[in-house]
């Protein structure tokens, strides 16, 4: 692969993607062979949300990892200041680094 991203470059992309998702500006973002997708389910005011990390492999997007979180807030931008968001961004970055340089089939 021609793209050789550093961990700090990937983390910056992940952080900007999460912030833009929480602002409601985007639902997905792609960097090289990695895609971050966002979806949510609003059931009785309880928001169950998922950020999914996918890789381009064998001509289609394959799921790598799901990051689940819940909120009683309909406004995700209010969540960006929550302390656990930084941990989630770090976790997504770590997973992205596993796949961005070495696409591979998952074991499930």
Enumerate the predicted regions with their spans:
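Short acidic DE-rich linear segments
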Residues: 2-3, 101-108
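Negatively charged, low-complexity tracts enriched in Asp/Glu with abundant Ser/Thr
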Residues: 2-40
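Enrichment for repetitive, rod-forming helical segments
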Residues: 18, 84, 91, 102-105
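N-terminal export/targeting and maturation segments
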Residues: 6-13, 89, 93-97, 101
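Positively charged, low-complexity intrinsically disordered regions
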Residues: 12, 16, 55-56, 64, ...
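Acidic, low-complexity, intrinsically disordered interaction modules
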Residues: 29-97
């Amino acid at each position: 692969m021609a793209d050789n991203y550093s961990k700090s470059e990937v983390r910056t992309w992940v952080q900007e993607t999460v912030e833009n998702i929480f602002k409601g500006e985007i639902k997905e973002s792609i960097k090289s062979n990695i895609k971050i997708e966002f979806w949510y389910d609003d059931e009785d005011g309880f928001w169950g949300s998922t950020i999914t990390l996918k890789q381009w492999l064998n001509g289609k997007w394959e799921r790598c990892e799901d990051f689940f979180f819940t909120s009683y807030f309909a406004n995700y931008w209010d969540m960006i200041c929550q302390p656990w968001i930084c941990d989630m961004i770090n976790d997504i970055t770590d997973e992205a680094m596993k796949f961005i340089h070495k696409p591979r089939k998952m074991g499930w």
